[in-house]
Amino acid sequence: MISSELTNDQIIDLISDYKNFKRIIEASVPEDDRRRNQNRQNRNKDLTKLSNVQFWQLTTDVNDELMKRLTDSGADASLNDLDLKRGKAQSKLSRLKDAKFHKLILDIFTEIERRNLHHLDMGTHNNGLDEGDLNFYLNDTLFESFKINDDFMSVNGIISIEVFRELKTQFTLYFQNTLHRIDPVDTTTTRLPILLETIIKIAKLIGDLLPVLSSVSLQSSLENEIVYLKSALSHAITSTRYFLTYGDLIPRIVAQSSISEVIFAFCNIAQIVKIKSTSRDDISRNEGELSDIEAGMKPLKIIEKVKNEKNGKDISSLGDSGSTAVSFPSSGKPITKKSDMPVVVASPSISIIEKSESSIRESGKVRNNTSGETNLASVSPLKNTKNSSRITSEPSPREGLPLKVVSNSRSPSPQGNTLPLIGKFRQDYQASPPKKVITKPVAETAKPYANIPPAADVLYSPTVTKMRKFREKVQKFAPNSGLGLRISTSEENLNNSDVNSTTHNANINNLVEFVESKSMVVLPMAQGILNDVQASKSKLFKSARSVSRLCQNSIEIIPILESVIDMTTKAMVQKSFKLDLGEHCKEIIERLTDCSQKLSELCTYGCDSTKLGKKRFYQKLADILMEVTKRTRELVECVKMANRQTLSQDLSSFFNYRSVQ
């Protein structure tokens, strides 16, 4: 058996009992009897068989019985009878005669020395606390409410986490030592009592902390709490000194209440100036979640600022080209900072011309007409020279995207190697425009909402996979046929309606991809928050997220909803989209806009208990998120329905065209 089986309470009891036994034996038992007991070969074998815990229980009972016999007091007899096991042991010890009882004390005294338990002095005990060798006061319920929560922690805190933990350890050690009987202070000893050493350490830690608190711009409440802390500490030192001087004359509640006042004052100060975490444990605890720094930077204002910048760029785009360009964000991540926002190009006509040039080069590979060679000089005068310097100085928003750029050696233009790649998904829809279309202004042949990123930038979805397989089957009808628009092999002219149908079809498919990808992000996030709200009402409340964490997670949904609302609204204003999306889609967008505003207001004031009760907050948050989930799914179905109608119309047009031929 080793001493680590004993708790700290038991170790302190053994040390105290050993000192009591030694002092009493030296005062009352003759030296010959003590020497005879030490030289005795036949020791008490029953004591050697006991474990450390059992031996501690016996030592405690013997010490209590010894105190009763020395004071001739039986006042504690009724208390010991409450525990059956301890009551039986006390009753047996009380029936022992003085000779046998003294012999038992000598045996216990010898057994303590044989087990080397008397070497566990308080200095070794304190060193073990710092090294974590002893589990100090693990079952203490007094400090359960003293655990650090999110309200006490802050990155701009003044009190370091190390000082907080050291003070907590000293507070616990002080309470621990007040639970045992304290003898009057012996002036002949060279070492201070452990209780006095503890209160001196507490005073030193608080004294080192006061200059740090004084460096802060003092508020009236903080000044009052500092005065309260100094007064409580002075009272605790005085109470400890009197408690050690007069022993049992002063109840232990006096010392405990005095140190409690110090703890209360320290907690009030910690709530005002906050505790700063510097350990690795607190940093890795929130890894993978939303940073508290970002949450402290008022994310709603950041989102509003980004929206204003985006709207300003859209207005400048309208002033240059006279049309509105629909630009889908290429990332499925929530837009929480400026660098994540997609850049809106001020002159969309340049990108449209580059796409026209790319489609012309693609058509040159399949066109067999000798007179149908394209002259890019007819397109170059249409470039906006006003914004050409801006294009060379500002990086393209697609330069950072993981796209494969295919160099075209046939292109006589120096921009041929830097043109953005049109993905395979859009190449299926890119057609070879006839001569009449090339000579027309670009604004008439290309829709202003054609500036949509390639499908490689958008998350893949099951619907997109089905559409691609469908297009591959349709393309088998003819080697040079496309869905809704046939690539001409002769001098025939195609109507502009066919070109518009193709462009419209490509954009409606990209809209489906965009809405589906965003729904895959919004729905799991909303469901996770709803699960935490439900857990907060059940027995799993401790495992649920706090109100502040729910607010932060809900704020992440807002920019994603706004991007879906913004892109879908811009698509609905186009003439070709009005018939497909209909009034039902418009109603869904209005409901989602209302949900986004309510969620923003709730998450701004939801963490403040004075604004809204916790129960009411959970109810409102659940209602909003359920509405968001419902409307998001309806929007996905609405866009899918519009896409199916478009595919059906294109397919019927394709077969009608084939039958005419």
Curated annotation (Swiss-Prot):
One of its GO terms (molecular function) is MAP-kinase scaffold activity. It is found in: Bud tip; Bud neck; Cytoplasm, Cytoskeleton. Residues 356-365 have a biased composition (Basic and acidic residues). GO terms for biological process: bipolar cellular bud site selection; invasive filamentous growth; pseudohyphal growth; regulation of cell shape. One of its GO terms (cellular component) is actomyosin contractile ring. Conjugated with HUB1. HUB1 has not the classical C-terminal Gly residue, so it is still unknown how conjugation may occur. This is Protein SPH1. The gene is SPH1.
